[in-house]
């Protein structure tokens, strides 16, 4: 079981990061709320991981702290919620926001996320509410808004294409992802900024 990786970021392609440690490059799927906080390529990062085995693949999911990973583990225990949907949930809102939505019994907040219908939202609230008693604490307080800059980043067209691809990977349909990015596109914005703004506008 791979539970933690420390190494150098080789590539960042939302929602994937390639981390080199011990001469091995690990491809890690990360929620966008965690991806935003990663340092730039070429710098060191520590990622807490969850190893998931499927019939057709073995995947690593990564998080910035143990609490986020614990929430992911609880989510995939919920009936009808697999790793891909859990990743989409934690990309669309922070752990703190998700906990608050469940505790407020607010299915409307969850329905806005890709792949979440009314029944799934209600099931999440019922199944997750009791589990949160031992989960959330200081590390689930909202983080300060991050200012993302990329002075030497890709062109705006490249950034928009990367943002659309990331949203599709998170469960949005291609046409919907393209529309979401077009609505918030800015000439000098990098892909991470576009993804964050698109997800924020969808809530």
UniProtKB/Swiss-Prot annotation:
Residues 1-64 are annotated as: Domain I. The keyword DNA-binding applies. One of its GO terms (biological process) is DNA recombination. It is found in: Cytoplasm. GO terms for molecular function: ATP binding; four-way junction DNA binding; four-way junction helicase activity. Residues 65-142 are annotated as: Domain II. GO terms for cellular component: cytoplasm; Holliday junction helicase complex; Holliday junction resolvase complex. Keywords: Cytoplasm, DNA damage, DNA recombination, DNA repair, DNA-binding. InterPro entries: DNA_helicase_Holl-junc_RuvA_I, Hlx-hairpin-Hlx_DNA-bd_motif, NA-bd_OB-fold, RuvA, RuvA_2-like, RuvA_C, RuvA_C_sf. Its main location: cytoplasm. Homotetramer. Forms an RuvA(8)-RuvB(12)-Holliday junction (HJ) complex. HJ DNA is sandwiched between 2 RuvA tetramers; dsDNA enters through RuvA and exits via RuvB. An RuvB hexamer assembles on each DNA strand where it exits the tetramer. Each RuvB hexamer is contacted by two RuvA subunits (via domain III) on 2 adjacent RuvB subunits; this complex drives branch migration. In the full resolvosome a probable DNA-RuvA(4)-RuvB(12)-RuvC(2) complex forms which resolves the HJ. The RuvA-RuvB-RuvC complex processes Holliday junction (HJ) DNA during genetic recombination and DNA repair, while the RuvA-RuvB complex plays an important role in the rescue of blocked DNA replication forks via replication fork reversal (RFR). RuvA specifically binds to HJ cruciform DNA, conferring on it an open structure. The RuvB hexamer acts as an ATP-dependent pump, pulling dsDNA into and through the RuvAB complex. HJ branch migration allows RuvC to scan DNA until it finds its consensus sequence, where it cleaves and resolves the cruciform DNA. HAMAP family: DNA_HJ_migration_RuvA (MF_00031). Belongs to the RuvA family. Has three domains with a flexible linker between the domains II and III and assumes an 'L' shape. Domain III is highly mobile and contacts RuvB. This is Holliday junction branch migration complex subunit RuvA. The gene is ruvA.
